C-alpha cells in the first residue's frame, strides 16, 4: 500500500503530467530573477546619469505630499541608488543558484525584501493616489515623476517575487505555489476577515470629512478657507463628493474579499451572473490601491509626527490649524497595509490546485 501511494505521488508530479503548465507563459519563477537584475542595471544606470548632472531628476521636495526620498540631496540619493542597484545585481546573480548556508540565505532574503519595501514606501508620494482619484473626474495628470514612481513599483514587485521564489527554493517548496509536504494553510488566511474589516473601515473618516465639505460644512477646516477654496474651484463640491464616494465604494468592494459575492458574481449581473469571480480580478486592483494608499499615508504620517515634535518645518496650515485636511489621512497607512494583506489572504484562500506540483 505504501509503495502504491508513493507511485501515485510520483505520477502526479511527473514532467509528463505538467507539460502543459511548463509550456505556458506562467513560468515566472524561471525568469523573474533575471528581470529583477535587468531592472537594477537599468535603474542604476539612470541614477548614474543623474549623478553626473543629467536632467530629469524626479525626486523633488515640493511640499507636504512629497516622497520621503526627496529629503535627501539629489547627489546623495543618486549615489545611494547606484550603490544599492549594483549590490542588487550581485545578489540577484547569487540567488540564481540558491545557497543553503544560513548567513548567505538570510542576507539575500533581507536585501530583496528591504529593497522592495524601500521602493514601495519611500519613492511613491501623494501624486500617485491623486492621479488615480482625479482620473474618475476625467482629469489626467501623468507626469515624469509619476511614471518614475511606477517604474520603482515595478522594480519593487520584481524583487519581491524574486525573494518569494528564492525562499521557496531554499525550503524545498514548489516555486509556483509555495506548497510543500506541510499542509498548513498560509497564516494570513486566518486573519483575512479582521484585515478586510480594518481595510473597509479605515477610509470612512476621510469620506466623512469630504462629504461634509461637499455640503459646505467646515468640518476640521477654517470656514473662510473652505469658502475661498470653493470660490476658486467651481468643481470643488463635485470633487469632494466624488472623493468621498470613492472611499465608501472602495470600502464596500473591499468587503467582497470575505463575502460570497466576492467569489461568485451575483445572479443579477448581466452575462456573468453566477460565474466565479477570477481571483486576480480582485487581487490586482486591491494591490494597486494598497500600494498607492500606503505610500501616501506614510508620507502624511511622517510629516504629522515631525511637525508635532518640531523636528522640521512643515506647513502648519495643513496639519496644526486645519486637522480635517491631513488628520483623516493618518488612517491611510493602516488602510493600505490592511488592504494589501487582505488581498494576499484572499488569494491564498481561493487559489486552486497548482498546475506545477499538483497540490492544493
Predicted regions located by residue number:
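An N-terminus-focused feature that recognizes amino-terminal "leader" regions
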Residues: 22-154, 166, 343-350
Amino acid at each position: 500500500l505504501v509503495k502504491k501511494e508513493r507511485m501515485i505521488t510520483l505520477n502526479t508530479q511527473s514532467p509528463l503530467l505538467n507539460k502543459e503548465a511548463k509550456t505556458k507563459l506562467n513560468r515566472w519563477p524561471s525568469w523573474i530573477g533575471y528581470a529583477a537584475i535587468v531592472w537594477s542595471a537599468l535603474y542604476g544606470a539612470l541614477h548614474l546619469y543623474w549623478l553626473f548632472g543629467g536632467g530629469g531628476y524626479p525626486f523633488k521636495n515640493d511640499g507636504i505630499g512629497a516622497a520621503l526620498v526627496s529629503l535627501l540631496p539629489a547627489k546623495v540619493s543618486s549615489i545611494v541608488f547606484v550603490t544599492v542597484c549594483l549590490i542588487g545585481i550581485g545578489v540577484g546573480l547569487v540567488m540564481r543558484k540558491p545557497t543553503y548556508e544560513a548567513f548567505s540565505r538570510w542576507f539575500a532574503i533581507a536585501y530583496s525584501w528591504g529593497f522592495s519595501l524601500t521602493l514601495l514606501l519611500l519613492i511613491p508620494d501623494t501624486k500617485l493616489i491623486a492621479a488615480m482619484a482625479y482620473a474618475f473626474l476625467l482629469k489626467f495628470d501623468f507626469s515624469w515623476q509619476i511614471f518614475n514612481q511606477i517604474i520603482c513599483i515595478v522594480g519593487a514587485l520584481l524583487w519581491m517575487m524574486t525573494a518569494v521564489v528564492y525562499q521557496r527554493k531554499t525550503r524545498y517548496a514548489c516555486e509556483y505555489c509555495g506548497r510543500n509536504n506541510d499542509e498548513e494553510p498560509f497564516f494570513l488566511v486566518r486573519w483575512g476577515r479582521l484585515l478586510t474589516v480594518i481595510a473597509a473601515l479605515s477610509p470612512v473618516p476621510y469620506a466623512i470629512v469630504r462629504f461634509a465639505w461637499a455640503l459646505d460644512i467646515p468640518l476640521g477646516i477654517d470656514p473662510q478657507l473652505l469658502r475661498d477654496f470653493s470660490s476658486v474651484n467651481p468643481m470643488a463640491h463635485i470633487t469632494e463628493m466624488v472623493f468621498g464616494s470613492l472611499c465608501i465604494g472602495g470600502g464596500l468592494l473591499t468587503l467582497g474579499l470575505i463575502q460570497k459575492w466576492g467569489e461568485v458574481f451575483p445572479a443579477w449581473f448581466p452575462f456573468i451572473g453566477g460565474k466565479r469571480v477570477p481571483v486576480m480580478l480582485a487581487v490586482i486592483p486591491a494591490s494597486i490601491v494598497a500600494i498607492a494608499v500606503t505610500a501616501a499615508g506614510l508620507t502624511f504620517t511622517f510629516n504629522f509626527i515631525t511637525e508635532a515634535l518640531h523636528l522640521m518645518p512643515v506647513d502648519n496650515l495643513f496639519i496644526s490649524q486645519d486637522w480635517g485636511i491631513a488628520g483623516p489621512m493618518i488612517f491611510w497607512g493602516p488602510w493600505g497595509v490592511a488592504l494589501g494583506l487582505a488581498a494576499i489572504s484572499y488569494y491564498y484562500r481561493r487559489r486552486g490546485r497548482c498546475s506545477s506540483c499538483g497540490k492544493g
